[in-house]
């Protein structure tokens, strides 16, 4: 896993208000609003765990405080290379205006190799 997702890379989460299919980061169609910067938020808590024989990449929950955000697609990507690691399509558009927007990482991890 560390060969594919090195610990010294920068990882980010970007938000898109529409359903989009991506294999890398693009600013095209990305959310733009108060409290949200283009490119998204830098992820913290990089860790690789072993679960049922699989290597699993995990990060901490991401929070935007006092933000205006509308999301339908969440992209977790390697900002060093631009490549997508995980793309989540939400069932519906969710958002917050002038409040806390929190994204919890997928229970199965961001990436899994087994």
Residue ranges and their predicted role:
Residues 1-72, 79-114:
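Small cysteine-rich, disulfide-bonded extracellular modules of the LU/uPAR three-finger superfamily
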């Amino acid at each position: 896993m560390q060969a594919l997702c090195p610990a010294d890379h920068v990882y980010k989460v970007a938000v898109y208000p529409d359903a989009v299919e991506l294999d890398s980061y693009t600013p095209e169609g990305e959310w733009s609003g108060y409290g949200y910067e283009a490119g998204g938020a830098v992820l913290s808590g990089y860790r690789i765990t072993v679960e049922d024989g699989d290597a699993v990449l995990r990060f901490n929950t991401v929070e935007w405080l006092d933000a205006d955000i509308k999301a339908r697609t969440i992209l977790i990507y390697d900002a060093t290379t631009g490549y997508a690691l995980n793309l989540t399509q939400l069932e519906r558009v969710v958002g917050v205006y002038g409040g806390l927007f929190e994204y919890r990482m997928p229970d199965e991890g961001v990436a899994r190799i087994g």
